[in-house]
Amino acid sequence: MSSETFEFQAEISQLLSLIINTVYSNKEIFLRELISNFSDALDKIRYKALSDPSKLESDKDLRIDITPDKENKTLTIRDTGIGMTKADLVNNLGTIARSGTKQFMEALTAGADISMIGQFGVGFYSAYLVADKVTVISKSNDDEQYIWESNAGGTFKVTQDDDGRAIGRGTKMILHLKDEQTEYLNESKIKEVVKKQSEFIFYPIYLHVLKENEKEVPDEDAEEVKDEGDDKAPKVEEVDEDEEDKTKAKKTKKIKENKIEEEELNKTKPIWTRNPADITQEEYASFYKTNDWEDHLAVKHFSVEGQLEFRAILFVPKRAPFDLFETKKTKNNIKLYVRRVFITDDATDLIPEWLSFIKGVVDSEDLPLGLSRETLQQNKIMKVIKNIVKKTLELFNEIAEDREQFDKFYSAFSKNIKLGVHEDAQNRPALAKLLRYNSTKSGDETTSLTDYVTRMPEHHKTIYYITGESLKAVQKSPFLDTLKEKNFEVLFLVDPNDEYAMTQLKEFDGKKLVDITKDFELEETEEEKKDREAEEKEYEGLAKSLENILGDKVEKVVVSHKLIGSPCAIRTGQFGWSANMERIMKAQALRDTSMSSRRSSRPTEGNDRTVKSITQLLFETSLLVSGFTIEEPSGFAGRIHKLVSLGLNIDEDAETSEEKEADTVVAEAPADSDMEEVD
C-alpha cells in the first residue's frame, strides 16, 4: 500500500495545537461532536436513497456503533453513512479550512468554552481532546476504501486500503486514547455521555462491550476420575436407568467465556412525534443539546392540521451564532423531515433570513418523500409551512412576558428583529411591538412602542425619536431641548440598524414616527405659532446674512423655536440622510458616493472678517453637536485660536496663512446637503 502525506492547512494546524496543548475540563464533548457528524453522514445517504434505492445496497441498516477496546486503548466509532472519497478525506479533514476555523481559535483565545467547537464547523478535531492519534477508514459508493491517519503533528497520511477488512459503506473512526483519557473506554462513562448529549439522535446508537459470562459445560474430567475409583472398589449395585441418566447430567462444570454484546443506547422515539404535555423541559434541553453546547432560551412545540399536517419544534438559542449574518452561510438550523425521513437542512423558503437563528425540526406527513431540494422551493405547500413564522412570533411574545428572559433575547437577537421590521412587510406590525429603546422618560430601563403610546397625551399624534452614535451622545443633543420642555417623550436610537427599521416602519398604532434631527413640524399652540412668526420676521435680515456667509454649505438658515440651550444646530431635510446615517455610510467601503456629493466652493465677499469667522465657527460647532463631522479640522482650530485671541485682547495686525485659509475655506457639507438647514 502506497501512502501519500499531506500538510494540514495552516489554520487547522494552529487549531490542533491549541486543542492539544491547552487544558480543558469538559473533554467529553468530543463524543457528541463525532456522533453528530456520523448522524449527518447517515442523513446524506438516506436522502440520496430516496431517488436511488441502490445507494443502500451495500448496507441497508443505518446505524452508529461504538466499540471500546481496553486492551489496545482504542475507542472505535463507525457509521453506515455516505462515506468519504479520497478527495473528501484530503479536503474535509485537513487541507481546506472551514469558514469557522479562525473565528473559533479567536473565541478560544478570548476564553470561550471548548464546547462551542461544533458551532464553528470543526467538530471533527475535538477527537484530539482525548486521542493522540486518529485513524479514519472510509468507503464511499463512489470510490475505493481509504485510510486517513494523523497524530496532529502537522501532517496526515491517506492510503488506499487494499489489505484491510472491507467495511461496506460508511466511516470508521479509531481514536487511540491518551493514557489519562482511558475512562472513555468504560461502559458506564460512554452510556452517561451518550444519554446526556446524544440521546435524541435519530439513528440507533449501539454500544459493543466485551463481557465475561459464566457458562455450564459437561465436565469430562470428573467422569474419568469417578471411573477410576469404581475400578479400585468394585461394587455391584442395581440402578434404575433413569436415575443413572440423572447422575450423569450432574457431571458439569462452570467456565468463563468472553462475548461481545451490543446494547442500543437511544431507544427514545423522535421527540417531536410525542405529545408536548408528556415531554419535560429536561428532555427538550437534551434534544436541543445534540446540536449545541448549552441550553436553549425558549422552545415552541406544536402541530398543524388541515390543508397541511406537520409537527415542529422550534428553539431560540441563548446567544447568536458567530456567523449569524454571513451572506455565504449554509442555513442548516431547521431540518425538514417527511414522515420521519430527513429531506434537507437547506430549505431556504422554510423560514425567512431574519429568523435564521431559530433552530429546530419540521416533520410533514403530506409532502412527497421523493421531493428534491429544487422542487421543494417551488412546491406551494411550502408556503403553508411558513406559518411557522407566526408560531415563532408567538414564542417571542411569550418570552416578552418575562422581563429578564426578554432582555437576554433582545440583547442577542435585536438585530434580527430590526432586520425583520425592515424586510418583512407582512409581519412588520407584530415585530414592531418587540422593539425596545431607551427614552427621555424610561430612565435606565428600555421601553416598547406600545408603552410609549400609552404615555402619550390624548391629543398627541407623533412618536419622536433621535438617532446617534451612543446613548451618551443623544442624551446631550440640543435637539431634545424644546421637546423636553413640552414634556414630549423621545426615543433614543443608537444601533445602526434602528434607522433602517424606522424608515420602513413609518408609523405605529396610527402614530407617525418622526426623526427630530431632520426637518419636522413641531406641534404648537396658536399663541406659540404667532410668537414664532413674529421672531422669524424680526430676524429675517440676520438669517439672510448668515446664508450669504455660509454659501452652498447650507440650503437655508431659519429662526427656530426648537432650540433652547444651543444658539444653533444643523438639521437635514425630511427625506435626506441624518447625521447618524451619514456616519454609517461613511464607514462602508463601497458606499454610494452620489448621495454624499459636496457642493463646490463659493467665495464670500463684502463681509467683516470677524463676523465671517464667528459665523463659520457657529456652523462648525453646530455640525459637531448635531452629530456630523468637520471636514477641515485645521480651519476650525484656527477660528478657535482667533476667538481666544479676541477674548484676551491680543492685537492681530496680520493674519497667518492658516487664518486666511480658515476664513476662505469652505468645509464640505454633510450628506444630502441640498436638504440641509441651520436652525
Swiss-Prot record:
Location, primary (coarse class): cytoplasm
Q: Which UniProt keywords apply?
A: ATP-binding, Chaperone, Cytoplasm, Nucleotide-binding, Stress response
Annotated positions binding ATP: 37, 79, 124, 373
Q: What family does this belong to?
A: Belongs to the heat shock protein 90 family.
- This protein's name: Heat shock protein 82
Motif TPR repeat-binding in this chain: 675-679
Q: Where is the composition biased (Acidic residues)?
A: 217-228
Question: Partners and quaternary state?
Answer: Homodimer.
Q: Where is the segment annotated Disordered?
A: 216-250, 589-609, 654-679
What's this protein's function? Molecular chaperone that promotes the maturation, structural maintenance and proper regulation of specific target proteins involved for instance in cell cycle control and signal transduction. Undergoes a functional cycle that is linked to its ATPase activity. This cycle probably induces conformational changes in the client proteins, thereby causing their activation. Interacts dynamically with various co-chaperones that modulate its substrate recognition, ATPase cycle and chaperone function.
Q: Which Pfam families match?
A: HATPase_c, HSP90
One GO cellular component term of this record is:
cytoplasm
In which compartments does the protein localize? Answer: Cytoplasm
An example of a GO molecular function for this protein is: ATP hydrolysis activity
Q: Know anything about its domains from the record?
A: The TPR repeat-binding motif mediates interaction with TPR repeat-containing proteins.
- Record organism: Ajellomyces capsulatus (Darling's disease fungus)
